[in-house]
Design a protein with these regions (language model features):
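Chalcogenol-based redox active-site neighborhoods
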Residues: 1-114
Length: 114
């Protein structure tokens, strides 16, 4: 959930990092929050460079990418970098949802594609 401390920090960090990335890079934040809650959080946090998407209804993204925590109906903390041709260029599954991702590794993977 975007309202949890680690998700909050992560999305704010990527929102900040977006300024240094190519305008061809699109950053998406997926959660099982309702779209209304996502919009509220993004507005309150001043997040404009990260688009939030909701997997609340069917959790299809979580199922298809193997990041659904079934018992909690939440998504595991994971980062996917998708190349312009649609192939998966990089992935990072954070073993503990209370930990932040390795931002440097993610940004390096993104910059290699730009």
């Amino acid at each position: 959930s975007l309202d949890t401390p680690v998700c909050d920090m992560e999305v704010r960090r990527f929102n900040k990092e977006a300024a240094a990335l190519s305008d061809k890079v699109q950053i998406l934040a997926l959660s099982c929050d309702l779209p209304f809650a996502q919009a509220r959080w993004c507005g309150a946090a001043g997040v404009q460079a990260v688009e939030s998407l909701s997997d609340y209804k069917d959790v299809d993204f979580g199922k298809n990418y193997g990041v659904l925590i079934q018992e909690l109906r939440l998504l595991a903390r994971a980062i996917f970098v998708v190349a312009p041709d649609g192939t998966l260029a990089y992935s990072q599954l954070v073993p503990e949802v209370t930990n932040e991702p390795d931002y440097d590794a993610v940004l390096e993977a993104v910059k290699k594609l730009a």
